[in-house]
């Protein structure tokens, strides 16, 4: 890998983690971990796959930037993150990628129990 390529990858990686700061805490944690895993997993791929990988993550960063900007400007105060994948894009995925996408969707749509507070009449000893 050339120094220029490594610099581009690192810059994109940092930019994505920075954009994740706009996400709700549970999605930020999920997104950060997913990005770290994916970038680590693609460290040793060939040049063609590396270019596709970077292109997709650059698109993700651009979409997330726009959604974060729209969220800040929204008068309703509701943040809306994410997008639907067109069927033709899904058809390009390998089985392993479909499995990862399914796991990610399940994690992202889980009820957030991290911050839920339940009242208890008595302490449990």
From Swiss-Prot:
Residues 1-30 form a transit peptide. Keywords: Chaperone, Mitochondrion, Transit peptide. This is Succinate dehydrogenase assembly factor 3, mitochondrial. InterPro entries: SDHAF3/Sdh7 (IPR008381). It comes from Rattus norvegicus. Plays an essential role in the assembly of succinate dehydrogenase (SDH), an enzyme complex (also referred to as respiratory complex II) that is a component of both the tricarboxylic acid (TCA) cycle and the mitochondrial electron transport chain, and which couples the oxidation of succinate to fumarate with the reduction of ubiquinone (coenzyme Q) to ubiquinol. Promotes maturation of the iron-sulfur protein subunit Sdhb of the SDH catalytic dimer, protecting it from the deleterious effects of oxidants. May act together with SDHAF1. It holds the Pfam family Complex1_LYR_2. One of its GO terms (biological process) is succinate metabolic process. The gene is Sdhaf3. GO terms for cellular component: mitochondrial intermembrane space; mitochondrial matrix. It is found in: Mitochondrion matrix.
């Amino acid at each position: 890998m050339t120094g220029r390529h490594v610099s581009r990858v690192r810059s994109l990686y940092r930019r994505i983690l920075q954009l994740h700061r706009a996400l709700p805490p549970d999605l930020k944690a999920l997104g950060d971990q997913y990005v770290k895993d994916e970038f680590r997993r693609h460290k040793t791929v060939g040049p063609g796959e590396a270019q596709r990988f970077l292109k997709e993550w650059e698109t993700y960063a651009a979409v997330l930037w726009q959604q974060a900007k729209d969220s800040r400007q929204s008068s309703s105060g509701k943040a809306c993150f994410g997008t639907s994948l067109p069927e033709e894009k899904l058809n390009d995925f390998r089985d392993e990628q479909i499995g990862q996408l399914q796991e990610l969707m399940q994690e992202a749509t889980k009820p957030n129990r991290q911050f839920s507070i339940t009242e208890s009449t008595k302490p449990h000893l």
